[in-house]
Design a protein with these regions (language model features):
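Short Lys/Arg-enriched alpha/beta "domain-start" segment
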Residues: 1-2
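Nudix hydrolase/Nudix homology domain
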Residues: 6, 64, 70-71, 123-124, ...
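Acidic, metal-coordinating catalytic segment for phosphate/diphosphate chemistry
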Residues: 6-48, 56
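Acidic pyrophosphate-coordinating catalytic loop
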Residues: 12-16, 59, 118-129
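Active-site-adjacent beta-strand/loop module that shapes the phosphate/pyrophosphate-binding cleft
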Residues: 23-29, 122-141, 155
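Conserved Nudix-box catalytic region and its N-terminal flanking loop in Nudix hydrolases
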Residues: 34-36, 41-100, 148
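Conserved hydrophobic "DFG−1" position in protein kinase catalytic cores
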Residues: 44, 53, 133-134, 156
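A short coil-to-beta-strand element that immediately follows conserved catalytic motifs
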Residues: 109-116
């Protein structure tokens, strides 16, 4: 169960998509954190500056949530460890996952995704989200390719509608809200 962890780390628990890590500090204390495969989020923008969002029922919110489309860079912890061991660039792996998720969730074939930022979850959770801006896309003739059990509706919102959805609490993935409000909407509103 080593997974090439540094000598100061010990895996205390390993699940299907994450693990509890005990990291020994220089003073001997143990710092515990949770690590899981990183994820991707897509900021898909149309020529008329609308942003694609998905509407889906989310277990964690207990209702419908507006979200940026996306998913995991790798589906399991084992696949994530294999990716790390391969030496492949994580940003490149994230861009490939972004293309896969775009097709599955939105039915769009994307090209030239541009990394906006990598947002971390905080000190006690290692779960980065790679945000990609996508301005070049076309519809797949097959439409969405949803996984079993997924029910995802696609909508296009203006920057003003995105702000309203955030204010009303309809978008609850707060890292995505931060990226939208801090990086994306100012750019779109400036170019309008």
């Amino acid at each position: 169960m080593n997974h090439n962890t540094p000598p100061t780390e010990e895996i205390a628990f390993e699940g299907r998509i994450g693990e509890i890590v005990h990291a020994k500090q220089p003073d001997g204390r143990i710092f515990e954190y949770y690590r899981r495969p990183p994820g991707v989020r897509l900021v898909i923008v149309t020529p008329d500056n609308k942003i694609l969002v998905t509407k889906e029922h989310r277990r964690e919110t207990g209702g419908i949530d507006l979200r940026l489309p996306g998913g995991k860079v790798r589906d399991t912890l084992e696949e994530y460890h294999q990716l790390l061991a391969s030496g492949q660039d994580m940003t490149q792996a994230a861009a490939e996952a972004a293309a896969k998720e775009a097709l599955e969730e939105t039915g769009l074939i994307i090209s030239s995704p541009q990394l906006l930022t990598r947002a971390n979850a905080g000190a006690t959770v290692e779960w980065d989200l790679y945000y990609f801006l996508v301005e070049q896309h076309q519809e797949s003739q097959h439409g969405q390719e949803l996984e079993q059990g997924e029910d995802i509706e696609v909508a296009y919102l203006t920057p003003a509608e995105v702000r309203k959805a955030v204010t009303k609490g309809e978008m609850q993935e707060w890292r995505s809200v931060g990226v939208l409000l801090g990086m994306v909407l100012p750019r779109l509103e400036q170019s309008a």
